[in-house]
C-alpha cells in the first residue's frame, strides 16, 4: 500500500538519466535508501513527510548498494555504473548483480563526469593518457563507487595499468 506511494514519489522525481531500483516486495515498517548522491537526502526527507514508514539512508557506492539490495539490506539502491564493453550504464550490472530479483528501474538524474583540475589546467590534463605522467597525481574514489568503476573501465580501455597512475590506490 505505501510501497505504491513511495514509487509515485520516485516517479515524480524521475525523468532524466539515473537508475533507482526498488524491490517489488512489500516494504515493511522501514525504507532504506542506499547511494551517495545528495538528491537521495532530499528523497528521504520527502518520503519521511509522505509515508508512514521510517526512511533511512545508507551511504554505500553504486556497486555495494546493488549488492546490499541483493542481500535484502536496503529497499532502494542508486547506481551509475558504466559498462565499458557495452558503453552503457547500469542495466548490465543490475541484471548480473540482482539475479532473480524483481526490480523497477527509474532514471532520476543525468550528470557529467570529468577531471577536476587546478584553475587554468596548468598541467594541461586532457585525457586518461595524461594520468600516466609523473607530474600528475589523482585522488581516487573508493572501490565500488560509480566514479571508480568508470575510471577503472576507462583506464582498461586505454591500456593503462593502475600502477602507472600516481595516487590511484589513495582514496
Language-model features, listed with the residues they occupy:
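Ligand-binding cleft/hinge of the Venus flytrap
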Residues: 42-51, 128-129, 134, 147-169
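Short helix-initiation/N-cap motifs at beta->coil->alpha
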Residues: 58-67, 163-171
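N-terminal hydrophobic or amphipathic helices and topogenic motifs
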Residues: 1-64, 70-73, 81, 92, ...
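Short secondary-structure boundary segments
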Residues: 81-82, 142
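Short Pro/Gly-enriched coil loops immediately N-terminal to beta-strands
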Residues: 97-116
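Flexible hinge/capping segments at coil-to-helix
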Residues: 108, 117-137
